[in-house]
Amino acid sequence: MKYQQLENLESGWKWKYLVKKHREGELITRYVEASAAQEAVNLLLALENEPVRVNVWIDRHMNPALLNRMRQTIRARRKRHFNAEHQHTRKKSIDLEFMVWQRLAGLAQRRGKTLSETIVQLIEDAEHKEKYATQMTTLKQDLQALLGKK
């Protein structure tokens, strides 16, 4: 396992995940009967500040079809949590207009690169172009100075 599991923190994430799914109208309990399902949901809502008991609730009441998706969500959240601790692994976001993003995505796809790799490549290309332009300007000035002296 690459990332350490923190039971209290992850139980809080699980609680939030389940409450969000319930509010979106998804069935989060294993019960078909509405009253039993509502009773289990009310019990879950009461466990907001008791993270250890959330895991017990999950074992007893959660819809088994939701288990795999919840695990994937928690795994992704754990990864983001630990990556955010280090500057070099922290994800950044930038605002792009849709047309800009579309062109960038198309270029990345043609080059077979990720968006980040494509942006780095574009920056490097611009830097090389700038360096080349500076060298050409210097060369022109030197050439004019040589021709002007004669």
Swiss-Prot record:
UniProt GO BP: cell division; regulation of DNA-templated transcription
Statement: the UniProt record of this protein carries the keyword Cell cycle: yes
InterPro entries recorded: Arc_rbn_hlx_hlx, MatP, MatP_C, MatP_N, MatP_N_sf
Cellular component, GO, one term: cytoplasm
Primary role: Required for spatial organization of the terminus region of the chromosome (Ter macrodomain) during the cell cycle. Prevents early segregation of duplicated Ter macrodomains during cell division. Binds specifically to matS, which is a 13 bp signature motif repeated within the Ter macrodomain.
Family: Belongs to the MatP family.
Self-association state and partner proteins as the record states: Homodimer.
Cellular localization per UniProt: Cytoplasm
Xref: HAMAP family: MatP
Name this polypeptide is given: Macrodomain Ter protein
Disulphide bond pairs: none
A Pfam match: MatP
GO molecular function, one term: sequence-specific DNA binding
Main localization of the protein described in the UniProt heading: cytoplasm
UniProt KW keywords: Cell cycle, Cell division, Cytoplasm, DNA-binding
